[in-house]
Amino acid sequence: MIPFLLMVAFADTVLQVSAQSQPSCDSKVYCQGKLLHVVEMSRIFNDSKTFVELKMINDEQTTLENFDNFLRDTNHKRTRADLMKFVSDNFKQENEFESWTPTDFTDNPTLLSRIEDKTIRQFAQDLVKIWPTLARKVKKEVLDYPEHYSLLPVDNGFIIPGGRFTEFYYWDSYWIVEGLLLSDMHETVRGMLDNFLSIVEKYGFIPNGARVFYLNRSQPPLLTLMVSLYVSATNDMEWLAKNIRTIDTELRFWLNNRLVDVVKDGIVYKLAQYNSNSGSPRPESYYEDVTTASVFSDERDKAELYMDLKSAAESGWDFSSRWIVDEYGGTRGNLSALHTRRIIPVDLNAFLCQAFQKLSEFYQTLGDYPNATFWSKLVKIWQHSIEMVHYNRDDGIWYDWDNELSQHRRMFFPSNFAPLWSETFDSRNAEILGEMAAEYFITQNMMDYHGGIPTSLSHTGEQWDYPNAWPPMQSIIVMGLDKSGSYRAKQLARELARRWVKANLIGFRQTGEMFEKYNVEVPGQNGGGGEYVVQSGFGWTNGVVLEFINQFFTT
């Protein structure tokens, strides 16, 4: 074990050479500065996220002055006890949320009456009953004094993922919203969407999650698709008309900040990538990022890696061999070989293309034909670009594009199926594309796994790799195959959905828990790897199971 004083000295040294990195946000306590660096690098908390979620007892200026006095008084020879006392004197672990039961919660939604299988019906009801345990509302004190917290306060109650994720997250919310709508909780969904829209109005985009230290990045752009789910379920055109401009604003963030040129066969295309320009460690994983970057001596190399780490976090896949690029374009290496920003992700562009389509339809319905035309033109451009850049005719599937080597990354990832899920292709080709995708899936030996579809075939120890199966990835593949129009693909989707529901039910019966990810080799067993222990709850897991039950187990 490294002696505490040596850890402190290391912390001070690293800070001196890292001071020029762009911060994660403006806060000199939660996102940048010596206080954050010393506390996180001293490892007085096992989880880096713990410190940046503490409440500041005083205002920021007083807290920083107290820290300067602390450094002077201890003459930079502080002990662990000294630092822990400083933190306890200036910060407080406080629940930022109050108990809240959604007013529209019912333990007997209409979905249950359409499920014939008694076992599946009971499972669905058990999942519905979990929603109140994941329901949160921000305390009035946080709303009144937000400067003392890292939380981004919102007015309405919401559903969290669960476990260490005590605030709402962007892309998790898509499958949570789907599950809530299937649970007849329309008001709760409207409140969650209003929360997101208020964030867009304030910041111009939706950050990774509801913390100031997430303001350096977003997550997969699914707001418009959440709105589509809500409007389809409620036909709430008054709400849509009121909020259409803000929905538009969120998509334009991606157009204005995440597009790059892609050259293939001499033709230039514009496509999106995940790209955070913040070249400093993630505050919630500060120690881990500094450690990962310690292999580099040049501060510019460290800053580049920090940007790639944050860009990978923006993708939602933090972390995966998907973003690791070796000298040959393969996936050999560790997180220090992360090159997220050279990769053009097929799923991101599929999500955007579908969002453009939905937004165009919204404008059309509301009678705003110029805006409807603007977005429908983008749909055609993106469909063509996805086909020309991402689709591999030899393999019958879409791939990420390596924008430096100008080649497909021909590895198995569930994201390869995202264009099927998003239906971002000429509808006349749906059946053949579904048939080809099903063939690709089978030739990759994916039917060998009864605990779910693996996130990759790489054994890296990262959580978005083998042997983990993630709920949203199951949804993208299963629902994509089912919507394709190919009979073979639809049959495959039904079997995969049956396996996933069965595996989740096994785990639920054994533990009473729903997990954020599962092990493909052992049906029902939770997954592992990554920077934290597996979490239970779990918002998107419950949403995906309810989605599959609704699609494949109802009359």
Curated annotation (Swiss-Prot):
Which Enzyme Commission number(s) are on file for it? 3.2.1.28
Check the record and name the Pfam families matching this protein: Trehalase (PF01204)
Subcellular locations according to the entry: Secreted
Gene Ontology biological-process annotations? trehalose catabolic process
Q: Name one GO cellular component term.
A: extracellular region
Its signal peptide is: 1-16
Where are the active-site residues found?
318 (proton donor/acceptor), 516 (proton donor/acceptor)
Q: Which family does it belong to?
A: Belongs to the glycosyl hydrolase 37 family.
Protein name (database record): Trehalase
Q: Which organism is it from?
A: Tenebrio molitor
